[in-house]
Amino acid sequence: KEGYPMGRDGCKISCVINNNFCKVECQAKWRQSDGYCYFWGLSCYCTNLPDDAQVRDSSTNKCGG
């Protein structure tokens, strides 16, 4: 599974071309995952996630910002 991790506010985690930052963010939530900064979205994107990982779903997004 893969997807955009959410911050405490329910929004995607922003980044500016910093793959290491996103890798740390993804691994803080899911230890065996990987992550990178998705350039076009300027948001962290996680890969190698467990099936039950909660990632952003545009149909149920409750982002405060």
From Swiss-Prot:
Keywords: Disulfide bond, Ion channel impairing toxin, Neurotoxin, Secreted, Toxin, Voltage-gated sodium channel impairing toxin. Disulfide bonds join C11-C63, C15-C37, C22-C44, C26-C46. The keyword Disulfide bond applies. Residues 1-64 form the LCN-type CS-alpha/beta domain. The keyword Nucleus does not apply. InterPro entries: LCN-type_CS_alpha_beta_dom (IPR044062), Scorpion_toxin-like (IPR003614), Scorpion_toxin-like_sf (IPR036574), Scorpion_toxinL (IPR018218), Scorpion_toxinL/defensin (IPR002061). GO terms for molecular function: sodium channel inhibitor activity; toxin activity. Belongs to the long (4 C-C) scorpion toxin superfamily. Sodium channel inhibitor family. Beta subfamily. Beta toxins bind voltage-independently at site-4 of sodium channels (Nav) and shift the voltage of activation toward more negative potentials thereby affecting sodium channel activation and promoting spontaneous and repetitive firing. This is Putative beta-neurotoxin RjAa43. It comes from Rhopalurus junceus (Caribbean blue scorpion).
